[in-house]
């Protein structure tokens, strides 16, 4: 299944706020109410919607998400929490959380177009897994700095999570540590997602 490129507002009306996908918000609380609100949802439907929230927020294909699920399943600790850590430490997500890009798709474009350095080297892979002490900067070109400055100026200025530090004047972000799952900026039940994929993890 490919990455979603359809109407974004349609998704947030059904699933709720997805800040990684779009910075738009429903105009009223009723916009978050699914038309099937009064129909009792099956457990499968509930797990499916949680999985879709995660996939659309981080901009992943079905295959990519399943790959992360399998990696998390082999790691020590809670599979759901490890999954969130893996996704949050992606370079495109780090740029988004720093405010250097307004959405994760926008961050992915910055990386693909080689506007971003990690530890002084160009990285053009959005899924690059950042690690503690990584330093993320704009390439020393006017176009790169302008793109990131525009995003920083337009950013809603949400609190930078504790595992990151932002230097506005140097267009620089620092990864202080692996993210604690409590700092994930998305209302999600990761355990339902693990349950959704439980059979596929075992295959």
From Swiss-Prot:
One of the primary rRNA binding proteins, it binds directly to 16S rRNA where it nucleates assembly of the body of the 30S subunit. With S5 and S12 plays an important role in translational accuracy. It comes from Orobanche minor. This is Small ribosomal subunit protein uS4c. It comes from the Eukaryota. Residues 89-152 form the S4 RNA-binding domain. It is found in: Plastid. SMART domains: Ribosomal_S4 (SM01390), S4 (SM00363). Gene3D superfamilies: Ribosomal Protein S4 Delta 41, Chain A, domain 1 (1.10.1050.10), RNA-binding S4 domain (3.10.290.10). One of its GO terms (cellular component) is plastid. Its main location: plastid. Part of the 30S ribosomal subunit. Contacts protein S5. The interaction surface between S4 and S5 is involved in control of translational fidelity. The gene is rps4. SUPFAM superfamilies: Alpha-L RNA-binding motif.
